[in-house]
């Protein structure tokens, strides 16, 4: 039988976007699957805070209350556990960033809401902050599997924003000259950069400045002029 790829589900970064973390593991699970889920849930904050290299076996044993054999009977090794922990952390971040977005009919308002969610939730709902930033920085010259996972997560986020922008252009809410992907990359880069500065300086002001600047740009340069009076 062919071994399934890493992940508690067949995770597609282009489609996993509108579901809560509870739905992430939806379905009837065996006792072993429940244990595996619980290990991932408890390991996720460790990997997000300490990184792949910094998370030791003793850390995992302390967090899960299991011995080495009890942990790795469910995973092929530390890399698989770290990958599934990233999936879990990223899905929680995605769920938070999309909160309330679908309720807004206007495309620019949707983009602004995602900016607000990022800033207000500090980019993630797992201790340690944004799992994408944390994993990308650590894995840049390190673990290839985790780096590829982070790259796919980034692409899914870019695609999500791009779809909103493209829909706005189609509905004449956004100027047709706007390039959805470039706009999406700029928004993400602004937020992640501001988050990095805020974390280093232990000051949330850079994030709030980024929010203000992004909102202003979206209203002045992205929202189509005729749509402003609606």
Question: Model regions: which residues?
Answer:
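C-terminal peripheral helix-coil segments that are non-catalytic and often amphipathic
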Residues: 2-29, 109, 113-120, 155-171, ...
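Basic, helix-initiating cap at the start of DNA-binding domains
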Residues: 2-50, 54-66, 80
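Short coil/turn segments at alpha/beta junctions that flank glycine-rich nucleotide-binding fingerprints
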Residues: 49-53, 104, 125-128, 171
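Amphipathic alpha-helical segments used for helix-helix packing
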Residues: 110, 124-145
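Alpha-helical structural segments
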Residues: 34, 38-45, 49, 63, ...
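Short hydrophobic/aromatic patch on the recognition helix
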Residues: 65-75
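Membrane-interface starts of transmembrane alpha-helices
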Residues: 176, 180-184
